[in-house]
Amino acid sequence: MTYARIRIAWPKGSLSATLDDTPTARALVAALPLTARAQTWGEEVYFEIPVEAKLERGAKQIVPAGTVCFWVEGSSLALPWGRTPISEGKEPKLVSPCNVLGRIDGEARDFASVKSGDTMTLSLE
């Protein structure tokens, strides 16, 4: 069930995402708007956000490209668009199981233009 739509922007682009109705998605929306410094790990962008959450039922480590994830251990939003350094197949493999919040609405490969240190801005659409 759709809970909210957010906009994720960085210096060279922006994408929309649809969030499902989960406890972590609600906590993320309550923290918006926010900015953070991007880090990259293979074909994944992640950044720390001021959200605390517990691992939810249904948390996953291997997800489809374009999944919006929350890495509980690092209090970070994780946005994979392809293989990570620990991927075994074509799908992204996250560093550990993460809460699944929703899905990027556009072309997740656009995140390839994000560089470590870029400012990421998240807001409600």
Where are these regions (language model features)?
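Glycine-rich active-site loops that engage anionic ligands at enzyme catalytic sites
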Residues: 14, 20-27, 31-125
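Extended, loop-rich substrate-binding clefts of extracytoplasmic carbohydrate-active enzymes
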Residues: 1
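Helix-rich terminal scaffold detector
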Residues: 4-5, 9
